[in-house]
Amino acid sequence: MTRSKILVLIPARMASTRLPGKPLLDIAGVPMIVQVLRRAEEAAIGRVAVATDTPEIAAAVTAAGGEVVMTRPDHPSGSDRIYEALCKLDPAGEADFVVNLQGDFPTIDPRSISDVLPPLDDPAVDIATLAAQIHTEEESLNPNVVKAVGSPLGGRRMRALYFTRATAPHGDGPRYHHIGLYAYRRAALERFVRLPPSPLEQQEKLEQLRALEAGMRIDVMVVDAVPRGVDTPADLETARRLLSKA
């Protein structure tokens, strides 16, 4: 898998109600979206661009020397926004793989971004994603923590069987906290965005279940820790503290 074949896309919108203007909030002297851009660039796996419908976000990324693509404001999901960005940035179809990195992971370890790619060396895999082992009962019981349920394949890789907000699987053994970072084969992303929302997707409010219900294969790489997302003022202060020390 060569760098020229990989496109890392970071969707960013001004949609947060708990943190208005979240992508542009200052973290260690630059907007949060620029911190995420830097982490993606540090991963050094391929071309990186931000996909947004907001001119202010585009201006901040451009001022930081990053690449940006404007997308429509009415997309029903982040995957649809990513697909529009892919078509605009790479109309010739040179990129075979697309990484979707959330725009609120300013402190993500760049190695975690590259860790999502190895499953796609297997031609049977359509989509790859990440998870980290859960170590507390509180995390297991939290419906805001999505659990990845999978069959071990050896090493740190498993084949996803289900994703759920419930506490699963039942009984003794590890449980895994799903991390919303995805790598798609281009053809898989094209297929995914053409599928209608599925029953389990709508029930669980988890977009990735659409792929599983359609028979697509998702493999999961297990990493050491869940990246710190920024959803609340407390999260923002934590990110500022961590990156001010970097």
Swiss-Prot record:
It catalyses: 3-deoxy-alpha-D-manno-oct-2-ulosonate + CTP = CMP-3-deoxy-beta-D-manno-octulosonate + diphosphate. The keyword Disulfide bond does not apply. One of its GO terms (cellular component) is cytosol. InterPro entries: Cytidylyl_trans (IPR003329), KdsB (IPR004528), Nucleotide-diphossugar_trans (IPR029044). Its main location: cytoplasm. It comes from the Bacteria. Pathway: Nucleotide-sugar biosynthesis; CMP-3-deoxy-D-manno-octulosonate biosynthesis; CMP-3-deoxy-D-manno-octulosonate from 3-deoxy-D-manno-octulosonate and CTP: step 1/1; Bacterial outer membrane biogenesis; lipopolysaccharide biosynthesis. It is found in: Cytoplasm. One of its GO terms (molecular function) is 3-deoxy-manno-octulosonate cytidylyltransferase activity. It is an enzyme of class 2 (transferase). Keywords: Cytoplasm, Lipopolysaccharide biosynthesis, Nucleotidyltransferase, Transferase. GO terms for biological process: CMP-keto-3-deoxy-D-manno-octulosonic acid biosynthetic process; lipopolysaccharide biosynthetic process. Its EC number is 2.7.7.38. Activates KDO (a required 8-carbon sugar) for incorporation into bacterial lipopolysaccharide in Gram-negative bacteria. Belongs to the KdsB family. This is 3-deoxy-manno-octulosonate cytidylyltransferase.
